[in-house]
């Protein structure tokens, strides 16, 4: 059975990468953080001189200090076709982890780039991200995963959801 293409979204540091790691490690999905993908593709080259980064890893590690700048760089990358990055991500991986722009979301949704959208919520512990680096909202997702408990709770919640989304292909690897 073919795995559905999953778009995993949510506010910064709410657990998107952790959800994707669970999907990779236990359910055979592939993913790369969109921030890492973009850092490797173009952001490091665009910012290395401005911030004096020695290498791509240093640029990627510093991304939280420049959220709005990264957001705008990714928006610019997706002109004129707002679904460009999404198509590139899904050509290489089963999951696109970390989309933040509603224009790109709508472009991908309207062209069938992804199958399902999962919002990761940790709002009981962390604030929402600023609007200058995040324009998506929970209502845009097909499903919401609660990440307000323990890591074990999160793994259980991911398992329940993936068994519902793809019940015939969820044997743990």
Features from the language model and the residues they span:
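Walker A/P-loop
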Residues: 17
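ATP-binding Walker
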Residues: 14
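Hydrophobic anchor at the beta1->P-loop junction of P-loop NTPases
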Residues: 8-10, 96
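ATP-dependent small-molecule kinase phosphotransfer cores
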Residues: 34-94, 100
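Post-Walker A helix-loop "phosphate-sensing" segment adjacent to the P-loop in P-loop NTPases
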Residues: 25-32
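Conserved catalytic-core segment of NTP-binding enzymes
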Residues: 116-160, 164-167
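ATP-dependent NMP and nucleoside kinases share a basic, alpha-helical "lid"
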Residues: 86-135
């Amino acid at each position: 059975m073919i795995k559905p293409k999953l778009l995993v979204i949510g506010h910064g540091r709410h657990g998107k990468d952790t959800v994707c790691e669970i999907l990779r490690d236990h359910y055979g999905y592939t993913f790369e953080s969109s921030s890492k993908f973009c850092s490797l593709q173009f952001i490091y080259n665009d910012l290395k001189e401005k911030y004096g980064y020695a290498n791509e890893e240093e640029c990627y590690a510093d991304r939280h200090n420049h959220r709005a700048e990264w957001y705008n760089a990714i928006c610019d990358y997706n002109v004129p076709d707002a679904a460009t990055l999404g198509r590139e991500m899904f050509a290489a991986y089963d999951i696109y982890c970390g989309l933040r722009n509603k224009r790109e979301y709508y472009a991908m949704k309207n062209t069938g780039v992804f199958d399902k959208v999962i919002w990761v919520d940790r709002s009981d512990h962390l604030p929402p991200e600023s609007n200058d680096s995040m324009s998506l909202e929970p209502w845009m997702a097909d499903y919401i995963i609660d990440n307000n408990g323990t890591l074990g709770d999160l793994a259980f919640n991911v398992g329940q959801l993936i068994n519902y989304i793809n019940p015939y292909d969820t044997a743990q690897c």
